[in-house]
């Protein structure tokens, strides 16, 4: 048997319409290849580019016309069919015509095995330039993170300034790259901008000489907040706006507390209470802050007797859907920042071995208040962050206790985490328990009163814990 396989062919005549009445071309075409693969060559043969009018490849046009072969007076063949499948034989006359707009015709298969392969998800999502670009972006992000980690470790362990210079260069290069690709690829720009938060924070934190302390945290928080505000102003992606809002608000909160710790000597109780209080304020004011950042047009309500104000321009009304999306993204970011500040403050309050019982009350009340506050929000992202407050806190305390060699406390944190998971499982098996509509009106009022009482009790307990009452009484 010969080593070369002979490809079956069919000899046909192809008619292509044109201004001069059409052009008939005889050609030999492979009969077992899909039309999708042979049509580009057929199109180049029967419709050559004209020299005078500079016509280019129709596939390169802004809205290319999809062409296919068809019998004279018949419907175009499916692009996934072969000439053998549709019954084309030697001597047939075919026409090259446009595929009508609308949903594509069902693919033609010859047996069940072919159908299983053709209609599988793996065949529909084959490897292509998009996957290559995505892999390159992931590789670049991984390189940035690995380089940042290595530089920080080198600076901390050896004390050499080389690590500081390298991490500063990585931060600068990442920031420039994120700004450079903003107009070309919004997704890549957002990914690089989010990744740049890590080297920026590391570069600013390592910029303060001496032992690590409040000044390092102050400078790192300032860098993160500044870069977040810059990225948030130019981010076209709603998810990017939410992320940068969360990092900006968290950075500003940590900046205020770290600034106070740099100026005065304050205890961990004061730091924790300040972070929890900032998180509570941010969460309560999330709706107002998000509306302000989205720049909603303020309503003009005339006084009695005043003339009716003019209607809003159509451009403002047409821009309202975009502003609503931006407001929702800001709202999600503000809620996330409030949860992160509350968790950080709770860890600062009870991570030490001699934590006060009042500190534990603040931690539990803040977590319970966040869970009860989730009933107010309709957004799934906001609910997820508020309900995840307790889980983030349990995991953070578990890690802190293990690092501090407090394994008994870590077991208690693990038990609390198991109880929280059990609550989720019960709610998943009985959805009515987690639905507020199934509760009576008196029960809803009781839950609202409990949530208000927990929030109102936090500030007096914080004042008692930090010694404000003792300071006033001693004077």
Curated annotation (Swiss-Prot):
Part of the ESX-3 specialized secretion system, which is required for siderophore-mediated iron acquisition and for the secretion of EsxH and EsxG. Part of the ESX-3 / type VII secretion system (T7SS), which is composed of cytosolic and membrane components. The ESX-3 membrane complex is composed of EccB3, EccC3, EccD3 and EccE3. The chain crosses the membrane at residues 132-152, 161-181, 186-206, 212-232, 241-261, 264-284, 333-353, 354-374, 384-404, 409-429, 453-473. One of its GO terms (cellular component) is plasma membrane. It is found in: Cell inner membrane. It comes from Mycolicibacterium smegmatis (strain ATCC 700084 / mc(2)155) (Mycobacterium smegmatis). Its main location: membrane. This is ESX-3 secretion system protein EccD3. Belongs to the EccD/Snm4 family. Keywords: Cell inner membrane, Cell membrane, Membrane, Transmembrane, Transmembrane helix, Transport. Pfam families: YukD. Disruption phenotype: Deletion of the gene impairs iron-bound mycobactin utilization and EsxG and EsxH export. It is a multi-pass membrane protein. It comes from the Bacteria.
């Amino acid at each position: 048997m010969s080593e070369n396989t002979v490809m079956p062919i069919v000899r046909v005549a192809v008619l292509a319409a044109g201004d001069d009445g059409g052009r008939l071309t005889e050609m030999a075409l492979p009969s077992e290849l899909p039309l999708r693969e042979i049509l580009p060559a057929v199109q180049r043969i029967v419709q050559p580019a004209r020299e005078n009018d500079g016509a280019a490849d129709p596939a390169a046009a802004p809205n290319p016309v999809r062409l296919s072969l068809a019998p004279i007076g018949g419907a175009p063949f499916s692009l996934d069919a072969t000439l053998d499948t549709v019954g084309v034989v030697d001597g047939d006359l075919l026409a090259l015509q446009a595929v009508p707009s609308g949903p594509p015709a069902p693919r033609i298969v010859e047996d069940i095995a072919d159908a299983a392969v053709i209609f599988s998800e793996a065949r529909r999502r084959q490897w292509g330039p998009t996957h290559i670009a995505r892999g390159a972006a992931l590789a670049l992000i991984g390189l940035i993170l690995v380089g940042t980690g290595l530089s920080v470790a080198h600076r901390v362990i050896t004390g050499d300034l080389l690590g500081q210079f390298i991490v500063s260069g990585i931060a600068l290069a990442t920031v420039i790259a994120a700004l450079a690709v903003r107009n070309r690829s919004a997704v890549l720009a957002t990914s690089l901008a989010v990744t740049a938060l890590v080297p920026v924070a590391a570069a600013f934190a390592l910029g303060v000489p001496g032992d690590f302390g409040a000044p390092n945290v102050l400078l790192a928080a300032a860098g993160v907040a500044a870069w977040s505000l810059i990225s948030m102003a130019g981010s076209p992606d709603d998810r990017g706006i939410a992320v940068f809002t969360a990092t900006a608000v968290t950075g500003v909160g940590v900046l205020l507390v770290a600034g106070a710790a740099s100026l005065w000597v304050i205890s961990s109780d004061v730091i924790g209470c300040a972070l929890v209080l900032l998180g509570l304020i941010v969460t309560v004011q999330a709706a107002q802050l998000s509306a302000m950042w989205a720049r909603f047009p303020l309503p003009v309500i005339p006084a009695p007797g005043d003339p009716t104000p003019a209607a809003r321009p159509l451009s403002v009304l047409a821009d309202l859907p975009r502003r609503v999306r931006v407001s929702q993204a800001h709202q999600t970011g503000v809620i996330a920042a409030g949860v992160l500040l509350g968790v950080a403050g709770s860890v600062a309050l009870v991570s030490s071995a001699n934590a006060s019982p009042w500190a534990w009350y603040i931690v539990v009340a803040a977590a319970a208040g966040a869970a009860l506050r989730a009933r107010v929000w309709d957004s799934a992202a906001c609910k997820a962050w508020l309900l995840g407050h307790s889980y983030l806190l349990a995991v953070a305390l578990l890690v802190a206790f293990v690092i501090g060699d407090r394994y008994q406390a870590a077991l208690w944190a693990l038990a609390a985490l198991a109880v929280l998971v059990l609550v989720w499982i019960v709610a998943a098996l009985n959805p009515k328990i987690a639905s507020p509509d199934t509760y009576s009106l008196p029960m809803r009022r009781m839950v609202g009163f409990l949530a208000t009482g927990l929030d109102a009790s936090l500030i007096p307990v914080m004042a008692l814990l930090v010694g404000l009452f003792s300071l006033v009484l001693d004077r």
